Design a protein with these regions (language model features):
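Short helix/loop capping segments that flank catalytic or ligand/cofactor-binding pockets
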Residues: 99-101, 118-120, 146
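Glycine- and acidic
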Residues: 96-106, 137, 151
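N-terminal extension/subdomain marker
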Residues: 1-81, 99
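C-terminal catalytic or substrate-handling cores of phosphate/nucleotide-
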Residues: 65-76, 82, 132, 136-185
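Short active-site loop/helix that positions an aromatic residue
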Residues: 105, 114-130
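Short, well-ordered loop/turn elements at secondary-structure boundaries
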Residues: 84-86, 103-106, 130-133
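Long, internal scaffold/assembly segments composed of regular secondary structure
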Residues: 109-114, 140, 144
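Helix-hairpin-helix/helix-loop-helix acidic hairpins
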Residues: 81-97
Length: 185
């Protein structure tokens, strides 16, 4: 169960992330943006702030050998497909400003993508010379009162962490063999 009081835990006061190309972003209204964020810049933030970077993430890092192994395998052996295979991260913040290839964040936390963030941090192959990019939603917290801001923050954290896990039977049911069999019927 998610506790309401956890939605406004302390955040990282200020930080910067790098995006792939100058001014390459999609705005959603005036309160959100989607960018392609540098994995190395996320790794640097985690090195500086550790789990404080994930203070409002409801699940931090879920230790799962298979998923961690798959993320690490893509980073190390198929980095060009990382953007395609990874759901990315979601950041909530009091404010953000995009200027060229830099996004400045104020009072922010990664609320979804803790596992990805942790695996980027652990990866020795991600550095200033070897970087990759991943999708990132940046959402400005709305509300006039602390209660409204808390409620909004919690709603984003809940919604972005509520996906159902894929079971092996789900994968098998959609395998090419099963699809051909169903079409033949």
């Amino acid at each position: 169960e998610i506790k309401e009081s956890e939605s406004r835990r302390p955040t990282v006061e200020t930080g910067k992330i790098r995006i792939d190309e100058a001014d390459n972003y999609l705005l959603y209204g005036d309160g959100a943006a989607i960018v392609n964020v540098s994995a190395y810049s996320i790794k640097q933030l985690y090195a500086q702030h550790n789990t404080n970077l994930l203070s409002r993430n409801l699940r931090y890092h879920i230790a799962g050998r298979d998923i961690d192994k798959a993320i690490a395998d893509t980073i190390n052996n198929d980095p060009d497909s990382f953007w395609l295979k990874n759901n990315g991260i979601t950041i909530i913040c009091d404010d953000f400003d995009i200027d060229g290839k830099e996004v400045r964040l104020r009072n922010f936390s990664i609320v979804n993508g803790g596992q990805t963030t942790y695996m980027l941090h652990k990866s020795p192959s991600i550095n200033s010379d070897h970087d990759l990019y991943l999708p990132c939603k940046i959402i400005r917290i709305v509300g006039d009162t602390e209660d409204e801001k808390s409620s909004f923050s919690l709603s984003i954290a809940k919604a972005t962490n509520s996906q159902k896990a894929i079971k092996p039977v789900d994968l098998k049911a959609n395998s090419p063999e099963q699809v051909r069999f169903a079409q033949a019927m």
